[in-house]
Amino acid sequence: MWQAEVRVDLDAIRENVSWLRSGSAAELMAVVKGDGYGHGMVPAAHAALDGGADWLGVCTLDEALTLRRAGITVPVLAWLLAPGLPLHEGVTAGIDLGVASVAQLEEMVEAGRVAGRPARLHLKIDTGLSRGGATISEWPELLDAAAKAQADGAVEVVGVWSHFVYADAPGHPTTDRQLAVFHEGLGMVEKAGLRPRYRHLANSAATLTRPDAHFDLVRPGLAVYGLSPVAGERFGLRPAMTARARVMLTKQVPAGAGVSYGHTYTTDRASNLAVIPLGYADGVPRDASNSGPVQLGGVRRTISGRVCMDQFVLDCGDDPVAPGDVATLFGTGRDGEPTADDWAEAVGTINYEIVTRFGSTRVPRCYDGERP
């Protein structure tokens, strides 16, 4: 018997990746950073590969090394790399590394020297996000340094890449501007004498809506897990995560009873209350107080009062409810339960954050569709 659980449907991940892969001639990198967006990095990676993914993408060196320790041998790109990391371990493990500056390139050269083999690099150009990557004015210097390092046998420039700002808002002019900057940057790559095998720019949203941005490799993340990056569009994706818990306690209270800390909710009639053993330590946003949707007894209800560290309360009115009944916070929506999108709307965030929060806590994660 379980008290609370996050269930992950690995067949949904396989199906989503297969569908995404069929929509483009480009290779596909399934992004499994953030513990697979809360779905479990290694199980999600295996499922994505089953579905036809060619690459895996992560942020950190530790994430990439974990994939290698799990026996995964496909190309892996790691791109969020602070100074001073043991990058030679990544080079030895055959991990591709993202490079955003000349200083970072110098670290990669040293890592290759220590590892005794060239570091495989993807040079990143900042096309407008103002985050990682070399700006268009810095780009020639990075390209010249990379070309020299490659000529010296210290590195191999495998890819050139960037990241969109507004791809989740189809038609936004910034996307076209970024694409133009990327093309400008690619022209400079050629002039520097580099011939990288992979050019990549498309995240989930661009994979789904901008075939002109697919180039040689697409990098879907959220869509792998069945969630849409574009508001109001489902694209036929199948959500992979369900979060639920069993009612811990029920009680009858009179009209006018204050509920949870601060009594921010008061019953307007005699009511049956259900205490659910999930709280902000389990990924339930405290901002879901008096707003988070939950299905219990086939009825959508709203969290009553403040979310606590370990529990919250539902006002069930006259409806019968008993300890052990299942409360579903979100799932696919097929049976009328809330979705991660519903939760994101209720608390003023994005579906990415909802699944990542719920899937990366003390709540046990269980899997359907596991393969031997």
Curated annotation (Swiss-Prot):
Residues bearing PTM N6-(pyridoxal phosphate)lysine: K33
Catalytic residues as annotated in Swiss-Prot or TrEMBL: K33, Y261
One Pfam family recorded for the sequence: Ala_racemase_C
Molecular function (Gene Ontology), one example: alanine racemase activity
Keyword Transferase: no
SMART domains, per database record: Ala_racemase_C (SM01005)
The UniProt record lists the keyword Transcription: no
Parts of the chain that traverse the membrane: none
Known pathway: Amino-acid biosynthesis; D-alanine biosynthesis; D-alanine from L-alanine: step 1/1
Binding of substrate, residues: R131, M309
Highest taxon of the lineage: Bacteria
One Gene Ontology term, aspect cellular component: cytosol
InterPro entries attached to this UniProt entry: Ala_racemase (IPR000821), Ala_racemase/Decarboxylase_C (IPR009006), Ala_racemase_C (IPR011079), Ala_racemase_N (IPR001608), Ala_racemase_pyridoxalP-BS (IPR020622), PLP-binding_barrel (IPR029066)
Cofactor(s) needed by this chain: pyridoxal 5'-phosphate
CDD domains attached to this UniProt entry: PLPDE_III_AR
Annotated catalysed reactions: L-alanine = D-alanine
Any one Gene Ontology BP term: peptidoglycan biosynthetic process
Keywords from the named record: Isomerase, Pyridoxal phosphate
EC number: 5.1.1.1
Function statement: Catalyzes the interconversion of L-alanine and D-alanine. May also act on other amino acids.
Protein family: Belongs to the alanine racemase family.
Entry protein name: Alanine racemase
Source organism per UniProt: Salinispora tropica (strain ATCC BAA-916 / DSM 44818 / JCM 13857 / NBRC 105044 / CNB-440)
Name of the encoding gene: alr
